[in-house]
């Protein structure tokens, strides 16, 4: 009888494990490197490489705009991109809980394969383990990319730089929370690979000083971290922050601040003021960048400070997210 759920036998390393790998993962991620089924993948490469890893525990596994599979590819690909690297290879490790439906696992693997194709990366190695549980799933992905010979990071930020946000705040956070609270809304996660957007910047004459994708803790937290690393002050204009009316209403209903709400397909970019118009044009012309906006600038004020000029003309200091926030958002 064909099995329909994950059992402990699928983690034994025996016939059930082989059937699981061959029936789902090898089929979904099929490529010549993975097909060798050796203990490690040997891939071509030259020069400096970028390496990152991330783990994904999002609850629920499927949500409006994505699923844990798409998220696991986007998150790791975007981390490579934020250093200006060209993403190339991924590995993936799956922790499967007993009771997980095979059909759900197939959907997730297919989603990962489709997202990897969109991002231009190849899944070259993987692993599965099974634990007792209630039908859950956790994924770890590691990514390798090729550096492009440009130093990009928070330490490169300069006074006078302009801060560009690639799109609307808070959509992933709102999508996950609305699912958990059974709130009827059509807000969709912004989960997306930012390959086209970053490639457009990296192949242009724009000088990119820093990029950071906006995930847990939201824009406020990542800007605070970058301000502290750079030793500079970041000034934002609240009126310039892009937030959709639906997300703004959702925040008002639950008392949330869009600045602290996570995304999974947005980034903040710091460029010299002389390059801001061209950078903004390139981002808006790329996939997932239509709502990009200049939201602030960098100055040589108090080191590590992030200040928001409110809509009524006041000023408030921003700190990193304190406390739990929304657990298992990614």
Language model segments and positions:
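Helix-biased detector of long, well-ordered alpha-helical tracts
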Residues: 1-330
């Amino acid at each position: 009888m064909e099995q329909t759920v994950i059992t402990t036998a699928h983690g034994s390393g025996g016939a059930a494990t082989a059937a699981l790998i061959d029936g789902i993962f090898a089929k979904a991620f099929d490529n010549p490197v993975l097909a060798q089924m050796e203990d490690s993948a040997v891939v071509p490469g030259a020069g400096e490489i970028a390496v990152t890893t991330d783990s994904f525990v999002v609850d629920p596994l499927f949500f409006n705009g994505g699923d844990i599979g798409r998220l696991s590819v986007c998150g790791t690909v975007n981390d490579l991109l934020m250093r200006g690297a060209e993403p190339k290879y991924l590995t993936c490790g799956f922790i499967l809980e007993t009771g997980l439906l095979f059909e759900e696992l197939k959907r997730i693997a297919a989603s990962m394969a489709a997202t990897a194709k969109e991002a231009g990366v190849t899944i070259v190695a993987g692993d599965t383990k099974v634990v007792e549980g209630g039908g859950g799933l956790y994924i770890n992905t590691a990514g390798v990319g090729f550096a492009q010979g440009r130093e990009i990071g928070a330490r490169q930020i300069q006074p006078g730089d302009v801060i560009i946000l690639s799109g609307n705040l808070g959509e992933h956070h709102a999508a996950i929370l609305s699912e958990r609270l059974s709130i009827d809304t059509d807000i969709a996660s912004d989960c997306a690979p930012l390959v086209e957007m970053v490639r457009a910047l990296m192949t242009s004459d724009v000088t990119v000083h820093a990029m950071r994708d906006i995930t847990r803790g939201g824009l406020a937290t990542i800007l605070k971290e970058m301000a502290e690393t750079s030793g500079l002050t970041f000034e934002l204009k609240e009126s310039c922050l892009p937030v959709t009316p639906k997300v703004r209403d959702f925040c008002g209903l639950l008392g949330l601040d869009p600045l602290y709400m996570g995304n999974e397909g947005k980034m903040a970019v710091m460029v010299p003021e002389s390059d801001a118009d061209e950078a903004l044009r390139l981002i808006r012309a790329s996939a997932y960048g239509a709502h990009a906006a200049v939201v602030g600038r960098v100055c040589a004020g108090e080191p590590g400070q992030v200040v928001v000029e409110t809509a009524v003309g006041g000023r408030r200091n921003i700190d990193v997210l304190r406390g739990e926030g929304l657990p298992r958002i990614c």
